[in-house]
Design a protein with these regions (language model features):
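Hydrophobic anchor at the beta1->P-loop junction of P-loop NTPases
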Residues: 140-143
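Short helix C-cap/helix-to-loop transition motifs enriched in small/turn-promoting residues
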Residues: 164-165
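Conserved catalytic-core segment of NTP-binding enzymes
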Residues: 229-323
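Phosphate-binding P-loop
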Residues: 131-137
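Active-site signature of alpha/beta-hydrolase-fold catalytic machinery across serine-
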Residues: 157, 161
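P-loop/Walker-type NTP enzyme "switch/lid" segment
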Residues: 95-122, 126, 133, 146-149, ...
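C-terminal lobe/tail of nucleotide-utilizing enzymes
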Residues: 2-16, 25-121, 230, 287-323
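Hydrophobic positions on the alpha1 helix immediately C-terminal to the Walker A/P-loop
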Residues: 154
């Protein structure tokens, strides 16, 4: 298997027991087999409205699924149509699907000629969805201990794999404000710097773009020096809550800078439910992973550790891009 990226989810964080004695500590919930528009039946009863204080991550919380019969009538239908329309109103863009581009950027979840590798992302997708469903989570940070572990590669291919699930809407935001890479890897031009979206200077619908029916992207190609300060600013929290409230995605993936050496991940913990850690099989050490676990401590669950590039000679190319 020389020269092949090996993707292995070798550690899955068990769910914490519910404070009310509800779900146990297993993360083996069934896949969501609802119809494509079922998630649009959610209503404001359980949603986080912009400006609403969020409970500590990992704590017991209600599902966003509507439980109020009173809200299943005309008002709920209007909300459903409105939010579905907001998703569809996002500018739709197309990817360069030439074999040269797919090979260069290793968009294996699109190419799918490498059945082993694309299948690995599908397996990761299924485990992710199962864990999120079991715990009532939606917001996942994707990071790595250090640069060069392939977190951008993993974030993009995981998002694309998720987008093939008809009943799941996914948003992928490039919040590695130190070294953004998603736009370049996909060959797309951001409409504006991510900082404009986070500070409220630019409307969400003017910034996010949509690929197909189920994947929305928040792109960036402009690094900013005060990355951690921006991520923990109140206006950032408000902007992200507004995005979730308006679009009601089923999964939100945030790519963040490497966890060690910067405080971006720590600063952003209040905005996420769980963390997916990308480790490099060629240089990530057990101490690196332990250091990341100490950052998370009891604040945010570690959803899993993905061992990437176990025997991939291209890791240096990814390291140069800070991904």
């Amino acid at each position: 298997m020389a020269g092949r990226t090996v993707l292995t989810l070798y550690a899955v964080h068990a769910a914490r027991p519910e404070a009310d004695g509800g779900r146990g500590g297993k993360s083996g919930g069934a896949m969501d087999t609802s119809r494509p528009d079922d998630h649009d039946r959610d209503t404001d009863e359980d949603a986080e409205a912009p400006g609403t204080a969020h409970p500590a991550t990992g704590a017991s919380r209600r599902s966003w699924r509507n439980r109020s019969p009173a809200l299943r009538g005309t008002g709920g239908a209007a909300l459903t149509a409105d939010r579905a329309g907001r998703w569809r109103d996002l500018q739709e863009v197309s990817l360069d699907l030439s074999q040269r581009k797919l090979r260069k950027e290793r968009l294996v979840a699109i190419d799918r000629r490498d059945a082993h590798l694309s299948g690995s992302f599908d397996m990761l997708r299924t485990r992710l969805i199962t864990a999120l469903k079991a715990n009532g989570w939606r917001r996942v940070a994707i990071t790595s201990p250090t640069a060069g572990c392939g977190k951008t590669f993993c974030a993009i291919n995981l998002a694309i794999s998720l987008s093939r699930l008809q009943a799941v809407r996914t948003v992928l935001l490039d919040l590695d404000l130190r070294a953004p890479g998603i736009a370049g890897a996909l060959g797309l031009q951001p409409t504006a710097p991510m900082s404009d979206l986070l500070t409220g200077a630019r409307d969400m619908h003017a910034h996010l773009v949509r690929i197909g029916g189920n994947l929305a992207l928040g792109l960036n190609d402009t690094p900013i020096p005060d990355s951690a300060e921006t991520l923990q600013a109140p206006q950032t929290a408000r902007a992200l809550k507004a995005m979730q409230f308006d679009l009601r995605p089923d999964v939100v993936l945030y790519e963040l800078p490497p966890a060690l050496g910067h405080d971006d991940l720590f600063a952003f913990l209040p905005q996420i439910d769980a963390v997916l850690l990308i480790a490099d099989g060629t240089h990530t050490t057990a101490e690196d992973i332990s250091a990341c676990e100490r950052i998370l401590s009891d604040r945010t669950p570690l959803l899993g550790v993905v061992l990437n590039k176990a025997d991939d000679p291209d890791s240096r190319r990814h390291a140069k891009r800070g991904s």
